[in-house]
């Protein structure tokens, strides 16, 4: 009998193990569920022009793109009831969403899908990196430093968003969504604590920290494929990269996305799903999968000596080399894992967690005004990798990645219930807002046409402004009032409406050559079961965000809707569907630090948002329609651009595009983890071809069996930097400097650096080229 049982066990165990493993994979790590929805995810390159274009965020005229730290992407999820409504959420590695970009994306989606995707159920949010190309918003004040509208920046975003949504639509399949949240303590500090302290002490006492520490994560699990992605929301600014950086970068949130996606693809390829999903190591990347030949150092050097630098040569248009690198880890029948690190109420939250210090003395900046000796220009926040901004970006990104990974592995609360949405356009330049009074009565106040205060020009500790502006300035000074009046003098009604903000730029009343600031804003609620996403077109401060979430959550709980009897989750998607700068509390506004001075519509802006979102939430749970509101203007045909086009590219006589100017030394051998390779190539302006879904540079490793070169790192890797520069300011000659900081995870072997580009001839035709360095050894 015992022998029969043993035989039965030996026969059945392999099948039992196989079935158990399959069930584990299907349910996303041991979480058994019944799929509620159709889910689909997508991702597409939105990097844009990597040269000549001013970066969006710091408003620093001198911060002009000249290369790539790593690429930018649009990441999308679609959730649909099998026979019902659907919602779309797009997260952009961009400073913010743009009203005109969304309008044009919706036009394209309607042409392709009819009324399936509209401005009502599509939400688009930006991570707020300050290291992406600017010029893609339609209002004057946001495109002054980019020399007007930049068509390439705009097109890259519209194309990328559309393609990421198309991917997500085509990937729609039955699946489940799980939610988890937890505290991340060391990735953000309050950069305006004096303003936060002006909030009522009773309100502040309800919260342990002066910034939100909670990360909320969604885990998407396909019924057949298992986990296919994750999206999370956490508040910290995209300002780990400084105002002097000129390399396009997704900053800390973009880095976190890259870490999470590479981790998943690598670990599902290398090891069994169950044993590896508890790891929180930074991914080792593709190179770790290549066969590791244990050749002697001498043999590797001898092999490398056969491969000298390749002169530049013309090629057909570059195929998608970047996708070749990462696709090495993917299954042909399954799309890549998509992980987005989304922005929420980050208005007063800085990733420069060491605090703000004076450059000249090393002492902490003035608490109330963030100045050094009365001036703001010397006060800078320090990230955890100070003075290395790239290291700070990596560290803050890594901290978010590790938190997300922990939440991902433990996510067990399944989203269940309706998919729905509400959207409205609201004119915030003249909104009547009803406020409760202490005596139980109410009063009606108004928001104001947009205006920016003097402290706006002071900047923040993440990026100080110029001249003699200071934060906390509620008076202004005569000289800058005179300068202001040349543009537009605010009338008494506007001054009184914005009080105590001294108006520097009366943007809401400036209309030449077209509108300087928005008046009509997009407000949106997306519902997935017990999760409600509030899409707001601005940067809410910590306490402003808390008040909005609390008001909406209270409205939902008190609705009497039986579907909402359990736990309700409310998250704010910041910088979404447009941009209108900051939103502070009424009390923070009185202090007039940078955030208060940048609250466009006056002291009652937040109250206006709360009022309108309560209306939207009520209509959502009661299944009532809402009026669409006034349509925002389409100013695309009015845009002006003063960015000089690329006229032509040239090389010195006898040289070719792609030639190596500065090669690696002969017999170069470097150790992993502490070596760096630098190669300089004859190049051409990256604006000639953005190489979307491609790469300007590769690190390639020699496959010794067949003597072929395999791509292992590209310009979407943080260890590889592509830097472009002209010979002189207006020169038609240029060069590309490629720097590879060899990671500890790189496999020993023979390597080379390859550069791709596109050159423009005098009469407009563009031809592509490539060139490669000599080989070198990594041990």
Curated annotation (Swiss-Prot):
It comes from the Eukaryota. It holds the Pfam family Ceramidase_alk. Disulfide bonds: none annotated. Transmembrane segments: none annotated. Glycans are attached at residues 368, 432, 667. InterPro entries: Ceramidase_alk (IPR006823), NCDase_C_sf (IPR038445), NEUT/ALK_ceramidase_C (IPR031331), NEUT/ALK_ceramidase_N (IPR031329). One of its GO terms (molecular function) is N-acylsphingosine amidohydrolase activity. It is found in: Secreted; Endoplasmic reticulum; Golgi apparatus. It catalyses: an N-acylsphing-4-enine + H2O = sphing-4-enine + a fatty acid. Mostly expressed in stems, leaves, roots and siliques, and, to a lower extent, in flowers. One of its GO terms (biological process) is ceramide catabolic process. The keyword Signal applies. Its main location: secreted. Keywords: Endoplasmic reticulum, Glycoprotein, Golgi apparatus, Hydrolase, Lipid metabolism, Secreted, Signal, Sphingolipid metabolism. Disruption phenotype: Increased accumulation of hydroxyceramides. Enhanced sensitivity to oxidative stress induced by methyl viologen. Increased sensitivity to C2-ceramide induced cell death. Belongs to the neutral ceramidase family. Hydrolyzes the sphingolipid ceramide into sphingosine and free fatty acid. Regulates sphingolipid homeostasis. Promotes oxidative stress resistance. This is Neutral ceramidase 1. The lineage of its organism: Eukaryota, Viridiplantae, Streptophyta, Embryophyta, Tracheophyta.
């Amino acid at each position: 009998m015992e022998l029969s049982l043993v035989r039965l066990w030996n026969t059945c165990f392999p099948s039992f193990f196989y079935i158990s493993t399959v069930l584990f994979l299907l349910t996303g790590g041991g979480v058994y569920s019944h799929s509620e929805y159709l889910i689909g995810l997508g991702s597409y390159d939105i990097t844009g022009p990597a040269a000549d274009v001013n970066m969006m965020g710091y408003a620093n005229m001198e911060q002009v793109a000249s290369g790539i730290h790593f690429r930018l992407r649009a990441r999308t999820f679609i959730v649909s009831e099998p026979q019902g409504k659907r919602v779309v959420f797009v997260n952009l590695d961009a400073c913010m969403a743009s009203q005109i970009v969304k309008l044009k994306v919706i036009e394209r989606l309607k042409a392709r899908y009819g009324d399936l995707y509209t401005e009502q159920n599509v939400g688009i949010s930006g991570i707020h990196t300050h290291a992406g190309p600017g010029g893609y918003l339609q209002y004057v004040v946001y495109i002054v430093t980019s020399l007007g509208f930049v068509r390439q920046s705009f097109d890259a975003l519209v194309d990328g968003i559309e393609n990421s949504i198309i991917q997500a639509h085509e990937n729609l399949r039955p699946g489940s969504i799980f939610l988890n949240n937890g505290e991340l303590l060391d990735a953000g500090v309050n950069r305006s604590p004096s303003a936060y302290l002006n909030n009522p002490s009773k309100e502040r006492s309800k919260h342990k920290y002066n910034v939100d520490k909670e990360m909320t994560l969604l885990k998407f699990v396909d019924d057949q494929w298992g986990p296919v992605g994750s999206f999370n929301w956490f508040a910290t600014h995209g300002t780990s990269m400084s105002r002097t950086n000129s390399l396009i970068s997704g900053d800390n949130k973009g880095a976190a996305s890259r870490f999470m996606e590479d981790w998943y693809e690598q670990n599902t390829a290398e090891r069994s799903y169950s044993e590896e999903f508890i790891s929180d190591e930074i991914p080792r990347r593709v190179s770790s999968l290549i066969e590791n030949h244990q050749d002697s150092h001498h043999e590797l050097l001898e092999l490398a000596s056969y491969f000298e630098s390749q002169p530049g040569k013309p090629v057909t248009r570059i195929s998608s080399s970047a996708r070749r690198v990462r696709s090495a880890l993917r299954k042909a029948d399954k799309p890549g894992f998509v992980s987005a690190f989304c922005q929420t109420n980050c208005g007063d939250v800085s990733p420069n967690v060491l605090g703000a210090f004076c450059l000249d003395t090393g002492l902490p900046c003035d608490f109330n005004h963030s100045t050094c000796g009365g001036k703001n220009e010397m006060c800078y926040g320090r990230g955890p990798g100070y003075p290395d901004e790239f290291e700070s970006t990596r560290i803050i990104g890594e901290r978010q990645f590790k938190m997300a990974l922990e939440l991902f592995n433990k996510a067990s609360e399944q989203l269940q219930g309706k998919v729905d949405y509400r959207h409205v356009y609201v004119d915030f330049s003249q909104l009547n807002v009803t406020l409760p009074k202490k005596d139980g009565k109410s009063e009606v106040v108004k928001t104001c046409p947009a205006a920016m205060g003097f402290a706006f020009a002071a900047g923040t500790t993440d990026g100080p402004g110029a001249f003699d502006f200071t934060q906390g300035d509620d008076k202004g000074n005569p000289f800058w009032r005179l300068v202001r009046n040349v543009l537009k003098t605010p009338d008494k009604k506007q001054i009184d409406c914005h009080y105590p903000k001294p108006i520097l730029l009366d943007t809401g009343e400036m209309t030449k050559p077209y509108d300087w600031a928005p008046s009509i804003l997009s407000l949106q609620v997306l519902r997935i079961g017990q999760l409600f996403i509030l899409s707001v077109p601005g940067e809410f401060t910590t306490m402003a965000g808390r008040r909005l979430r609390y008001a909406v959550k209270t409205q939902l709980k008190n609705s009497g809707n039986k579907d909402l009897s359990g736990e309700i989750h409310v998250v704010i998607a910041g910088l979404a569907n447009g941009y209108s700068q900051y939103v502070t509390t009424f009390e923070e506004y009185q202090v007039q630090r940078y955030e208060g001075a940048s609250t466009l519509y006056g002291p009652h802006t937040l109250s206006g948002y709360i009022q309108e979102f309560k209306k939207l939430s009520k209509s959502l749970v009661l299944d009532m329609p809402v009026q669409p509101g006034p349509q925002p203007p389409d100013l695309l045909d009015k845009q002006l651009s003063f960015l000089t086009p690329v006229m032509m590219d040239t090389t010195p006589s006898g040289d070719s595009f792609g030639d190596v100017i500065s090669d690696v030394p002969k017999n170069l051998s470097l150790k992993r983890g502490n070596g760096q390779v630098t190669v300089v190539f004859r190049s051409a302006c990256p604006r000639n071809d953005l190489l979307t879904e491609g790469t300007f540079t590769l690190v390639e490793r020699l496959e010794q069996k067949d003597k072929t070169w395999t791509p292992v790192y590209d310009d979407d890797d943080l260890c590889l930097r592509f830097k472009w520069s002209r010979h002189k300011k207006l020169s038609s000659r240029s060069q590309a400097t490629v720097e590879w900081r060899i990671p500890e995870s790189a496999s020993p072997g023979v390597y080379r650096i390859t550069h791709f580009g596109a050159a423009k001839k005098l009469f407009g035709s563009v031809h592509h080229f490539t060139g490669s360095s000599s080989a070198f050894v990594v041990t």
